[in-house]
């Protein structure tokens, strides 16, 4: 987990790369995870990321459902240096 966070928040000269790194997709099997849990995950992910980097604008958050699976797709715009 720490390695993942180091890659996500590593110094980068490209704002586009940072935005791409922060596009998070969590997939789960709907039979074991409720919509309320997905909302909680979304809120907590945004909270954790905002502790480490400054967010610019409004994050785009989508819950995508396909068959038995759902995905939480988060696109977070970061403030430039």
From Swiss-Prot:
The keyword Transferase does not apply. GO terms for biological process: cell division; regulation of division septum assembly. InterPro entries: MinE, MinE_sf. It comes from Syntrophomonas wolfei subsp. wolfei (strain DSM 2245B / Goettingen). It comes from the Bacteria. Prevents the cell division inhibition by proteins MinC and MinD at internal division sites while permitting inhibition at polar sites. This ensures cell division at the proper site by restricting the formation of a division septum at the midpoint of the long axis of the cell. Belongs to the MinE family. Keywords: Cell cycle, Cell division. The keyword Flavoprotein does not apply. Gene3D superfamilies: Cell division topological specificity factor MinE. This is Cell division topological specificity factor 1. The gene is minE1.
